[in-house]
């Protein structure tokens, strides 16, 4: 890393830390904010790329780079946590989308860990707005996999089986994360709006609420709740994913209690 780049980074960190020190926070809140700093959540993009609608989320600029106001980030991520928890507790499904190089491995790991639908490869147009067609493709994918595992495809020629295997591999790439999504989601969570605008547009068109991690170059009005963060850095997204994970698990726990209570009443 160049000396100039180091100086910019040092200045950015100093600006973020100074803001924390000057803000009336409890020791616990300051400690939590420091975790956001350590995870590089506060880095925006260059000032020249800033979307004017993001100005309210920007603390200052250092070396031509925007520094995100972490107070805004933490407020938004807490609000997001409540929305996610309440949506799942009420029986709604969520889908997580993140197809950028920084986001896809984190989205895949999170979805598998907490058992929610996710898209970590290309978001297929119509995943929400043409859900019936997508559902038909998912059913076909699941049947093809089942037939392959049961040996039902053994009756075909070697060439035909090779083609089936290629098709299974292709469909796995696009549908493995959403094969259990049997109804429209009640909430869309986007890891990096800049690289995932299609799910935001489809959610808006279908009147489905959306939450997104948004950098300073994106349009926060494209989603219902924008969380200003550094969405191009895997360390930042991995840290932020822990908040989403906690909210999902809390919602699932509340939902389980409701289901049990309902059965007892019957």
Feature roles, as predicted:
Residues 2-260:
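Ribosome large-subunit tunnel/peptidyl-transferase-proximal elements
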Residues 262-266:
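Non-catalytic, charged low-complexity extensions flanking SF2 helicase motor domains
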